[in-house]
């Protein structure tokens, strides 16, 4: 099984390329946001604990997120691969993720870092805001989100580069062109793991 992380600034195409990986390879997509919402809706013990933090305006602790992911991935032993979206965002989260995967005899195999120039990110997000009506896709909020991403993610890029799993991918062009840049990376690792 391949464990794939997709990094990239807001508007870099992470969601779109995740969909391409699912379509091409049958991978399972795990989004921390979706996972939290599902646990809260199901009123599980973990979901109730998370709701308590959220309702008080606090971030859900890393340990709780990792516990939710652990619960989910333990059911995914027969999948071709997992795409992690929105996690990890910090070095402690990355370390916790490595420990969690190691419990199953797995590791982070591939980190895809979608690289898109800032001007193009802003243009994509502004266009997305017009289409989707998302209130967080305005220029002021976009710049703040890009700054937060740059500050939080730079250490992770170094972290995964040192582990020789980071692959920078040019994130400009059509959806298909970008997917064709990613495919050889994934194909190489699929051959090695089979």
Swiss-Prot record:
Region (LID): 127-137
EC number: 2.7.4.3
Key word Transmembrane helix present: no
Positions of ATP binding: 11-16, 128, 173
GO molecular function: adenylate kinase activity; ATP binding
Chain's role: Catalyzes the reversible transfer of the terminal phosphate group between ATP and AMP. Plays an important role in cellular energy homeostasis and in adenine nucleotide metabolism.
Organism: Porphyromonas gingivalis (strain ATCC BAA-308 / W83)
Subunit structure, interactors included: Monomer.
Pfam short name (any one): ADK
Protein's name in the database: Adenylate kinase
Database matches in PROSITE patterns: ADENYLATE_KINASE
